[in-house]
A protein has these predicted regions:
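Acidic (Asp/Glu) carboxylate-rich active-site/surface patches
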Residues: 1-37, 41-145
Length: 145
C-alpha cells in the first residue's frame, strides 16, 4: 500500500507528464550565520515502497531521522547536496542564496529527460534549468521532497 506522499508524487508525475520526480528542499534558513543547505533527491520507482514510512522530517523523532538517513544513503537513491555560504547569503539575500544552494544540489540531475523538480515552497528556484513546480508545504506532501 502506498503512502499519501507517494500518491502525491505519482499524481504530479502524471499531471506534469514526467518520468522522473526530483524533490528539492532546503535547511538552514533560520540561523543567523549560514550556510543554507539544499538537497535534491530522486528515489527510483522500484524503491519508493521502501520509504513508505517517510514523513516531513520536522515531524520525525531524531532516532527515526537517523534511521531514514542511513537507509537513504545506503540505497540506490540519487541525491545532491548544495550549499550557499554566509558570505553568499549576505551578498545575495537569503532567498537568492537558497535558490543558489538548490541549483548546486540539482546539478547532477540537469540532463535527465522528462524530469520535473518539485520545490518545497511557493516559488520556483530562480536560475534552475530543470522544469520545476513549487509545492507549498511540499515536505509534508511529497516523498521526493
Amino acid at each position: 500500500m502506498s503512502s499519501p506522499l507517494q500518491e502525491f508524487d505519482k499524481q504530479q508525475a502524471i499531471r506534469l507528464e514526467a518520468n522522473c520526480i526530483i524533490g528539492i528542499d532546503e535547511a538552514g534558513r533560520g540561523p543567523l550565520a549560514g550556510p543554507v543547505v539544499a538537497c535534491a533527491c530522486f528515489i527510483p520507482p522500484a524503491m519508493v515502497s521502501d520509504f513508505a514510512d517517510v514523513n516531513d522530517s520536522k515531524k520525525l523523532t531524531e532516532k527515526k531521522r537517523e534511521e531514514l538517513y542511513n537507509r537513504l544513503v545506503h540505497a540506490e537513491v540519487a541525491y545532491g547536496i548544495g550549499f550557499a555560504s554566509a558570505q553568499e547569503i549576505d551578498r545575495l539575500n537569503i532567498l537568492q542564496a537558497t535558490f543558489l544552494a538548490m541549483r548546486r544540489a540539482a546539478y547532477k540531475f540537469l540532463n535527465l529527460p522528462h524530469a520535473v523538480a518539485l520545490i518545497d515552497g511557493p516559488y520556483p528556484a530562480a536560475g534552475l534549468t530543470l522544469r520545476q513546480e513549487p509545492v507549498i508545504d511540499g515536505d509534508a506532501k511529497s516523498l521526493a521532497i
